[in-house]
């Protein structure tokens, strides 16, 4: 079971840079990053409207959603910032550089999240191997971004 989850995560990892490259190209075609982001998120919104139509009985009530802590509703905002940023940054530094920096940022933040058990995550303390991994990753980021 864990192998399937790992393969799924790997496949998503393959798609993240593809999303950025597609959105950057779309931005050039439609006049800019804001327009491209709007089109991109409209497509995603449409998919979830369709899914919601088939799974409407499991949707939370409006009162439940508005009673949630605001930070729990920030995922869409963060996703919007990511998409807009990829459209602007990828043409400047390339998909590889962008992805390397994204992964480096993700690794740093997730090590901190795990170390402190943020939002109920299982606590996984920072250790020497994790620090060495971060150093190696940042070395790779520097090498990938060198001309």
Feature map (PLM): residue ranges:
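Structural motif at transmembrane-helix junctions in multi-pass transporters
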Residues: 29-32, 85-101
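Hydrophobic/aromatic residues within the transmembrane alpha-helices of Major Facilitator Superfamily
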Residues: 10, 14-18, 46, 77, ...
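Alpha-helical transmembrane segments of compact multi-pass small-molecule transporters, enriched
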Residues: 43-47, 101-116, 135
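Hydrophobic transmembrane alpha-helices of multi-pass small-molecule transport proteins
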Residues: 127-145
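Hydrophobic alpha-helical transmembrane segments of multi-pass membrane transport proteins
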Residues: 14-18, 22, 66-93, 143
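Hydrophobic/aromatic residues within transmembrane alpha-helices
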Residues: 36, 89, 116-118
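Hydrophobic core positions of alpha-helical segments in small-molecule transporters
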Residues: 39, 101-102, 129-132
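Membrane-interface interhelical linkers
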Residues: 1-11, 25-28, 33-34, 42-71, ...
């Amino acid at each position: 079971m864990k192998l399937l989850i790992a393969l799924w995560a790997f496949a998503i990892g393959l798609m993240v840079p593809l999303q950025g490259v597609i959105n950057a190209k779309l931005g050039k075609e439609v006049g800019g990053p804001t327009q491209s982001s709007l089109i991109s998120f409209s497509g995603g919104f449409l998919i979830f409207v369709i899914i919601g139509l088939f799974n409407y009985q499991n949707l939370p009530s409006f009162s439940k959603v508005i009673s949630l802590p605001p930070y729990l509703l920030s995922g869409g905002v963060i996703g919007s910032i990511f998409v807009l940023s990829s459209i602007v940054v990828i043409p400047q530094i390339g998909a590889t550089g962008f992805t390397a920096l994204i992964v480096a940022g993700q690794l740093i933040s997730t090590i901190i999240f795990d170390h402190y058990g943020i939002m109920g995550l299982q606590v996984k303390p920072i250790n020497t191997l994790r620090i060495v991994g971060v150093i190696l990753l940042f070395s790779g980021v520097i090498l990938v971004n060198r001309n």
